[in-house]
Amino acid sequence: MAKIRKKPKKSINKNINKNINKKSFTQSTPNIAEKLDNEMVAFLDTEFLTSQIKGGPPAKLVSVGFVVCGKNFEEVTRFHSYIYAEDKLHDRFQEMTGIERKDLLSAPDYELVMEEVAEQLEAWEVSRIYVWGPDKYVIQRDLLEYRKDISKRTRKIVNRILRMIKDIEGIYSAKLDLQSAGIGSLKIICGLGTEVSHNALDDAVDLKNIIRHIDLKGCSEHMLQIMKKYTAEKEVYYRLRRFREKWDDVSVGIQEKSLGLLKELGKVDTVEARALRDDLLVMCTGEAMVFPTLEEYIQKENVKTGKVIRDKNDK
């Protein structure tokens, strides 16, 4: 577990109950910065193990991280812990998160972790926990599915934590007039970098930095328009794509005609032409193509418009 500094502990149940009953808990505000003038909040993220089988068991919580901050988003403490689990980890999960089985086998058990989470939230008098996406649902399903043997005390604590959690994806997506965006995309359009670590604490800190940027500085209208265009074109591209592998027994004549059409389609700068071109390419050559990443798309759009958007690390 990682922490910056820790206040003296108080009564967990009493203070979390007090925070839950605050009027501000039930209010939806599109500007968290305003709440921070008088309250402490946390930004939280989780990592969870999902089944690779369609219709398989619910996701299992294996890591939790959060950052607590006050006025002007100033951090006061950080917390991170893995949660003990004996499950076998599939390759994709390990590649994305960097979590290895030994990390979970040596981690504290679920009850210890969640009680420590509650103690930290109570110690800093956190009034609200903000997440982006399904974290609340994952914690809730995990509690019902995998934590049947935990104590009543821990179960009550986790349920109180759940009542403190608010998913702000919908609120801030509406604020930015975006259908939906992940942490990685938001980092890019806010100029906060391009990498997403898939580490619970790092992603919680990224979320805090993104919301701070949106609330205090706002997002570039140019970047938001690119994001909207990217989302729309990506949806059309994958809706039009039909083929994912090379066709067998394609005659030389058809291949030559298709390659000729590919050259012509390369001159047409539309998403429909790109989808058809990529279908023909994979059918004839087996070369699989995908839609550009947001970062690649932004670079291309900036070349068109002559704009230069520098990364925060550029000097």
PLM regions: where:
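Short, surface-exposed acidic-centric catalytic microdomains
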Residues: 73-97, 101
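Short beta-strand scaffold segments in enzyme catalytic cores
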Residues: 64-68
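DEDD superfamily 3′-5′ metal-dependent exonuclease/proofreading module
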Residues: 1-57, 69-77, 102-315
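Short coil-to-beta strand junction motifs in C2/discoidin
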Residues: 60-62
